[in-house]
Amino acid sequence: MSRRKSAVKRTILPDARYDSQTVSKFINSLMIQGKKSTAEGIFYGAMDIVEAKTSQPGVGVFKQALNNLKPVVEVKSRRVGGATYQVPVEVRQDRRTALAMRWLISYSRDRNEKSMKEKLAAEVLAASRGEGNAVKKKEDTHRMAEANKAFAHYRW
């Protein structure tokens, strides 16, 4: 760990269409090689598809999907006397959101739909209903923490 003073959290500007910092952060995570306008096009296109399929505001469905993906606990490796234990720890609020976004993006990219807009829209819809691969990842994370509950006293 650094001995210097801790890094200052930068404030992120909200996006133009929904005026939301969460959406802006998601677009930044979605962006590849600095192509922000492409990432915005993908996200807004996906939200249009979601709105067409659900007749609900797309950003509302997106936020519901993120809430369904946020993990409460995760495991961290801790080495004690030559043995490595998977110790369950509670996840900080900002990390919960970051993990949910990361999982949503990565499992969207793995889907079989034609365009990234369609892939993202399908994964958001699935996650908002509590299904899909991203939700499965969250449940696996929770299951792993539950299985290693015996090592919780090794927390640091």
Swiss-Prot record:
Instruction: Name any Gene Ontology BP term.
Output: translation
The free-text function statement in the UniProt record for this protein reads:
One of the primary rRNA binding proteins, it binds directly to 16S rRNA where it nucleates assembly of the head domain of the 30S subunit. Is located at the subunit interface close to the decoding center, probably blocks exit of the E-site tRNA.
Subunit structure of this entry? Part of the 30S ribosomal subunit. Contacts proteins S9 and S11.
Instruction: Output one GO MF annotation.
Output: tRNA binding
Q: Which NCBIfam families match?
A: rpsG_bact
Per the record, GO CC terms?
small ribosomal subunit
Q: Does the keyword Hydrolase apply?
A: no
Keywords, in A-Z order: Ribonucleoprotein, Ribosomal protein, RNA-binding, rRNA-binding, tRNA-binding
Q: Quote the Gene3D superfamilies the UniProt record gives.
A: Ribosomal protein S7 domain
Keyword Transmembrane helix attached: no
InterPro entries xrefs: Ribosomal_uS7, Ribosomal_uS7_bac/org-type, Ribosomal_uS7_CS, Ribosomal_uS7_dom, Ribosomal_uS7_dom_sf
Q: Its domain of life? A: Bacteria
Gene encoding this chain?
A: rpsG
Protein name according to UniProt: Small ribosomal subunit protein uS7
Family, per entry: Belongs to the universal ribosomal protein uS7 family.
* Cited PANTHER family: RIBOSOMAL PROTEIN S7
Q: Could you tell me which species this protein originates from?
A: Gemmatimonas aurantiaca (strain DSM 14586 / JCM 11422 / NBRC 100505 / T-27)
- Pfam families reported for this sequence: Ribosomal_S7 (PF00177)
